Structure formats: structure tokens, C-alpha cells
């Protein structure tokens, strides 16, 4: 499962979620401004910005939305399984 760590009022988070939806990728969203454990996880991983996109507890792509949009189509096909 893909997890998008995001915040309210975050335009890059919206763009990342929209791109994943456009590519047909199923994901869950966790808002770190509403979930203190998730916030501590993201900070503990050394991240200071959102979105952060994880798969099975590991960082899927560095750079948030900007890193995600640079991925080739094959990347998204693999995520679909």
C-alpha cells in the first residue's frame, strides 16, 4: 500500500495525490497535522516537508511531488502491480 503523508492546505500534497489518482494508483493519505504519531514518524525519518510518499514503510520516491512527477511511466505501471 502506498501512503502519502500530507498536511492540510498543502498544494504539493494535492498535486501528488492528483497525479497518483490520474495514474490509477491506490493510496492512503495520512495528514501529519491531524496525526501526531505520523508527524513524529515523518520527522524521525529526517523529512521537513510534505508530501512524503512511502510504500510498505519505506520511502518510495525522494523529493515529494517533484520527485514523483519525474518518474517514468514504467514506475507507475509497477505500482499498479
Each predicted region: which residue ranges?
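Local sequence-structure signature of Cys/Sec-based thiol-disulfide redox active-site neighborhoods
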Residues: 1-25
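Short, glycine/charged-enriched secondary-structure capping and boundary segments
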Residues: 18-20, 44, 68-69
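Conserved beta-strand positions in the Rossmann-like core of class I SAM-dependent methyltransferases
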Residues: 28
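Short acidic active-site motifs
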Residues: 37-41, 71
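Structural micro-motif
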Residues: 45-53
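Non-catalytic, surface beta->alpha helical segment in thiol-disulfide oxidoreductase systems
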Residues: 55-81
